[in-house]
Amino acid sequence: MKPLPSEADPGYPDSAMQKIVIAIDGYSSCGKSTTAKAVAAELGYAYIDTGAMYRGVTLYLLEHDIAFTDLPRIEQALHEMQISFKRNRQTGRNELCLDGKIREDEIRQMRISNSVSEVSGLPAVRHAMVRQQQQMGHKRGVVMDGRDIGTTVFPDAEVKIFMTADTHTRALRRQEELAVKNELVELADIIDNLEKRDHIDSTRAESPLRRAPDAVLLDTSHMTIDEQVDFVLERASAALFAPAAGSSERNGG
């Protein structure tokens, strides 16, 4: 990864004065979370995996036998459940906590993947999660990835990236992720899951997956993670330095 300018460099934006929001949207298994985590670490920003939050809601509903059509019970559940993140000091990852318990491994299972798009499309769920996400990032200095960050959660984000990749590449990546956790799934089943989720996410009435008009398209089909991270960091650097450059020019510098 290419390093950003150091704080010793003249003109480095004062971290206490200037913070931005980096919104990374796109399809599942394009490398959003891995890229977003690395970018956040490089900038010293908070990282929020909004997809994990919807997976947490899905897990809660399944474990409490709440039908996805039972809207009154879902609204009650949203008031009862507590979703937060806890940093794992050994791995450096932010892990999802549901009612105070780390549930990171459970929310990544295929049974959750098969239902999360349906749950995340429910208006009550969407509204509750968007409110919480906006509260988490209201001080800025955050990298957030999901489906509607640049269009709904933070439409004023200074950096917007929309990630995509071909379905076969995405399926291979997801299969590798699951295999690491000893969950062996046929590639055809993963492709079917991705295609169904793409359709649901893109056609739902509430905050559909779409590229914001001012988002930069990033096809990660043939890119390494380092290349993806550098791509985002370059745009973050431009956003951070643009106001400073403008101020310098106005002052005759």
Model-derived segments and spans:
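NTP-dependent small-molecule kinase module
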Residues: 97-104, 172-181, 200, 204-253
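Walker A/P-loop
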Residues: 33
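Hydrophobic anchor at the beta1->P-loop junction of P-loop NTPases
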Residues: 24
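ATP-dependent NMP and nucleoside kinases share a basic, alpha-helical "lid"
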Residues: 104-181
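Small-molecule kinase domains that catalyze NTP-dependent phosphoryl transfer to phosphate-bearing small molecules
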Residues: 88, 133-140, 147-152, 156, ...
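N-terminal phosphate/diphosphate-binding loop that engages ATP/GTP or pyrophosphate donors
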Residues: 42-107
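ATP-binding Walker
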Residues: 30
